[in-house]
């Protein structure tokens, strides 16, 4: 049921014209860094459709810029899978790995860092190419929030203290869904930067939060059966059932309505952007960057997520694992010696 749940997304679907080439070459990068070694891991990775996802998130990107987006999507899901199992239920083990990965934001990693950390270091190096120090600092801040969120989730599992309310869950999950770093990369892939004085404006912040919320609601629907099998309790469907005593179908219907309401608000916020440009006295180039952010970053991460979730093999029933089983085929989080 979950991947077939319909959401009305009033935004056009787009895809990079270079998607076929990127899809054919998507295993080259993770294999070169030892992130995918076995044929089984390669087959499972291909089933996820991560090149398809990147080509929808970054439809304006081609060549090396699209490849960076594909590699980021590959890395995201390889990293996330490392926490499906005992590590993700142990806050100390989780923090040890997230700290090792986040260290790449501060400088070169030691050779003994785990493969998943070296993968992130390569992505971060390429991400910062051609971007201003202020942009890199902003993106690094978003990445740190992302890594911190994994520790929060592990704490919740360790203490068997699932979120009591939708509001509590959203506050935690908004970081680990990874939308903000994903949207950041749209600027890098498109070789533009939103004016920094506008980024934290009320309108922009509200637009981005809607993009984050829609993504996590879509993801929770798609991954519901997988998480039910694992005994995961922090999923919006389950939380709504606990909080309100609703049935599964009513909880899903409520989430559909939430997405619809948020997107109506999003379109209203979009209509305010010309006024934002006036208030912040943006010049022509800055207004163009703001418009590109609207069309090539925020919109595409909303619509692209929806289209990918409906077709990705990542959420197929065969990948649903029992509680305590590890969700990855290859250990990428252990330090090399």
Curated annotation (Swiss-Prot):
* Cofactor binding: number and manner: Binds 3 Mg(2+) ions per subunit.
Q: Which reaction does it catalyse?
A: (2E,6E)-farnesyl diphosphate = pentalenene + diphosphate
Q: Where does Mg(2+) 1 bind?
A: 80, 84
Q: Name the species this protein comes from.
A: Streptomyces exfoliatus
Pathway given in the UniProt record = Sesquiterpene biosynthesis; pentalenene biosynthesis; pentalenene from farnesyl diphosphate: step 1/1; Antibiotic biosynthesis; pentalenolactone biosynthesis
> Domain comment, in the record's words?
The Asp-Asp-Xaa-Xaa-Asp/Glu (DDXXD/E) motif is important for the catalytic activity, presumably through binding to Mg(2+).
For this UniProt record, give its keywords in alphabetical order, as a comma-separated list.
Antibiotic biosynthesis, Disulfide bond, Lyase, Magnesium, Metal-binding
Q: What does this protein do?
A: Catalyzes the cyclization of farnesyl diphosphate (FPP) to the tricyclic sesquiterpene pentalenene, which is the hydrocarbon precursor of the pentalenolactone family of antibiotics produced by a variety of Streptomyces species.
Give an example GO biological process.
antibiotic biosynthetic process
Tagged with keyword Lyase: yes
Q: Which family does it belong to?
A: Belongs to the terpene synthase family.
- In short, the EC number is 4.2.3.7
Taxonomy, top ranks, is: Bacteria, Bacillati, Actinomycetota, Actinomycetes, Kitasatosporales
Needed co-factor(s): Mg(2+)
List positions binding Mg(2+) 3: 219, 223, 227
> What is annotated about its quaternary structure and interactions?
Monomer.
Q: What is this protein called?
A: Pentalenene synthase
Outcome, altering residue 309 to S:
3-fold decrease in activity
Gene name per UniProt: penA
Residue positions binding Mg(2+) 2 = 80, 84
What does changing residue 77 to Y do?
20-fold decrease in activity and catalytic efficiency
Task: Identify the InterPro entries for this entry.
Answer: Isoprenoid_synthase_dom_sf (IPR008949), PentlnSyn (IPR054969), Terpene_cyclase-like_2 (IPR034686)
